[in-house]
């Protein structure tokens, strides 16, 4: 039998893996671009002031940049934890992934407003609401993966832990929305509690094979 007579059967799992890799690469690019765009409000400004005065004027924007950068970074890590276990996908999963990426890509805008108007109630509420929506969408995204059993080697306890961890941002940011109407400074200070909640929800998640 010659080589020309050989017909290799397509490997469906190989096609699924390649398609999932494309989803992951595209998602990584969106996360990276969004995190990079966060720095744009720090560029420019008054150049007639001494350097330390320029930095002082940028403190609110530095605050917003640092918080958003680390929150997006946490979601990128969570996205990686989910998709390293995904072995199959459907249009529903792709759509939820796109909705999450939409929220991530949108975040530089409320971040810029939050840094530019640090004492404004509207900018504070808008920022907290934007991150809350991102957190809720991500939770639905993770739930969808778990519900359809697209994890590999993840038990129910671990799945619940991952869903709970995805709620860490909404748990912190949703209550700060009404608080902002009473005291903007307190509301903004509470945002950093997200890292405490994240630590409490950290748990140990077994690596995928």
What spans do the regions from the language model cover?
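Multi-pass alpha-helical transmembrane bundle typical of ion/small-solute transporters
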Residues: 2-209
């Amino acid at each position: 039998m010659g080589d020309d007579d050989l017909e290799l059967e397509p490997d469906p799992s190989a096609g699924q893996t390649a398609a999932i890799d494309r989803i992951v690469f595209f998602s990584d690019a969106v996360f990276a671009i969004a995190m990079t765009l966060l720095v744009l409000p720090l560029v420019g400004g008054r150049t007639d002031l001494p350097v330390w005065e320029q930095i002082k004027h940028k403190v609110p924007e530095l605050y917003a940049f640092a918080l958003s950068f680390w929150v997006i970074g946490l979601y990128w890590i969570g996205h990686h934890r989910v998709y390293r276990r995904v072995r199959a996908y459907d249009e529903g999963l792709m759509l939820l992934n796109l909705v999450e990426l939409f929220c991530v890509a949108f975040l530089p805008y409320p971040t810029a407003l939050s840094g530019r108007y640090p004492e404004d109630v509207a900018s504070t509420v808008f920022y907290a609401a934007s991150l809350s929506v991102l957190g809720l969408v991500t939770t639905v995204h993770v739930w969808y993966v778990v519900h359809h059993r697209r994890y590999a080697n993840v038990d129910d306890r671990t799945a619940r832990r991952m869903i709970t961890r995805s709620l860490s941002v909404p748990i912190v940011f949703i209550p700060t929305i009404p608080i902002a109407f009473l005291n903007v400074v307190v509301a903004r200070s509470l945002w950093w509690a997200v890292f405490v909640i994240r630590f409490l929800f950290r748990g140990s998640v077994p690596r995928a094979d």
